[in-house]
């Protein structure tokens, strides 16, 4: 059974009263970000959009989707959506972020490579949003991963299904 991971992380830049929230889904097979949503509010609409994008097709049936115990993942809509798609929800133990280590690791890599120390370079949330979009493209299509035998996430998936 395949396993995917999800969570929400927050970005704040100086000189802005607003924040940006990233809600991705990471495929545990090849560490690819298969879907994500960026929003100025971590609300249910953000999670709905991310779920629709990630699981529009049936090839994730019988997958486990792991998350923390955030309110979004306890919501009735979330559980009904997963049930309708044949996806099994899984949640971390309360206050135990290592349970969602793959997602937390992605957030750590993302923030250390393109955000921490660079916050002042972003003069608007739009600039930050574009930088995140560009980084996710880089992460999926250009970043070589040792755990994938020196391949890129998309290459590893493609090679595995040939």
Language-model regions, residue ranges each:
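Hydrophobic (often cysteine-bearing) scaffold residues that line and stabilize catalytic clefts
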Residues: 1, 22, 43, 47, ...
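RNase H-like two-metal-ion nuclease catalytic core shared by retroviral integrases
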Residues: 67-69, 75-76, 89-111, 126-129, ...
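Mobile-element integrase/transposase regions
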Residues: 1-24, 48-49, 60-62
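Mobile genetic element proteins and their domesticated derivatives, centered on retroelements
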Residues: 7, 25, 31, 51, ...
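Short small-residue beta-strand/loop micro-motif enriched in glycine and branched aliphatics
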Residues: 32-36, 90-92, 116-118
């Amino acid at each position: 059974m395949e396993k995917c991971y999800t969570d929400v992380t927050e970005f704040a830049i100086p000189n802005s009263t607003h924040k940006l929230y990233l809600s991705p889904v990471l495929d545990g097979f090849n560490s690819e970000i298969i879907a994500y949503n960026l929003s100025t509010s971590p609300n249910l609409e953000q999670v709905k959009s991310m779920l629709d994008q990630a699981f529009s097709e049936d090839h994730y049936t019988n997958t486990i989707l792991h998350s923390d115990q955030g309110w979004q993942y306890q919501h009735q809509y979330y559980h009904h959506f997963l049930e309708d798609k044949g996806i099994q929800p899984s949640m971390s133990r309360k206050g135990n972020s290592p349970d969602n280590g793959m997602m937390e690791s992605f957030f750590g890599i993302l923030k250390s490579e393109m955000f921490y120390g660079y916050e002042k370079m972003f003069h608007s949330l739009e600039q930050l949003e574009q930088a995140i979009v560009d980084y996710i493209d880089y992460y999926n299509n250009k970043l070589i991963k040792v755990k994938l035998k020196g391949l890129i996430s998309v290459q590893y998936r493609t090679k595995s299904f040939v």
